[in-house]
Amino acid sequence: MTRAPVSEGAAGAAGGGRAGGLWRNRDFTLLWTGQCLSDLGGAMVDLALPLLVLQQTGSPARAGLVGTVGLVTALVCRLPAGVLADRADRRRLMIACDALRLAGHALLGWAVVTGRASLPVILAVVVAGSAATAVFSTAEHASVRNLVRPDQLTSAVARNEARTYGVSLAGPPLGGLLFGLGRALPFLGNALSFLLSLAAVWRIRGPLQQPRREAAEPLGASTVQGLRFLLGHPFLRALLVIAAPLNMAFTGMIFAMTLALRRAGVSAPVVGLAGTIFALGGLLGAFAAPALQRRLRLPVLITLLCWATAALMTAGALLAGTVAAAVPLAAAVFLGPTANAALFAHQAAVTPDHLQGRVVGGVLLAAGSAAALAPALAGALLARWDPVPATLVFPALVTAAALTATLSRGIRTMSA
């Protein structure tokens, strides 16, 4: 059994005021809190922005275009973001990203108030904000292992998972409420969230990366170096093959379940309640992740979680089109954060600090691309087949991930 190497940054995090629980870790708490606020603002805008475009143009297609442009921009920026996160000072990089997002959403709020929020203005803000978010999130992922002790990595990643599910519960209702009170309020609120995130990152005292001794390589060579390490490491290869189908399966299954319920005549409030149950399952799973990992060796944990998720998703698919399908699917979502926490914490441990950004960028690109294709796949399957056979495609994807986890040398040699 191989043992994950301990980085200088992580080793340094064990001392100097970082002893004790994760909540007592000042720098990690600052980063987590700032991102929690900015993620909340982003979740508000994710709901408010299509509503604004629909109200401005009357075109659902244009409202969808805005979301697609943001998603494509984020995916295109993932690999360059990884190079930046490894080459630049991560703290300054995140501050610059927050400043850009703050300015963009303040400008958009002002444009809404003055009646100048044209589609080109909205698209410009979306492109700039999505690019900055891709860079910020990559730098944040790459920084975490320098802020916490090695034994806290899984808890730190699980806490980030909890943040994601928490804001997905609170953000859309808050965004809808603010949009109803005043169309500019969600965008001005998001600008405020970036200001608070900027202030939090500014106050971080510890280093977010190890010193760079080598001269920076050209962009292309740096990208190739990161991809070569990613594809050449047995565990990281397995992570790619597991994360991409899992992300596609979860995104596609939830989307397909929503469409199937609506086609079956289930009311919109009940469909919304099912979505809330999924998010609650993920939130509770994120809190349970550290305890589950303490009880099982990592290879056993990952393999067991993948097979259990495949079984639960299959049960949900067999109940597709009924509200009862929400129960096994919520249980599957409950397991997701534990798998993510174990996989990404181990990724942070085995990747050298000077490659963290590029490896994270590559993994997020693969997982994000797969998730982006999932709604289109779900819609095409439901257009051709009944809900049960259509949704069974997604547990089949999880089964492929489970087989990888079972057979992969990279998973078998994870640290206990």
Language model: regions and residue ranges:
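Alpha-helical transmembrane-bundle signature of multi-pass membrane transport and export proteins
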Residues: 1-416
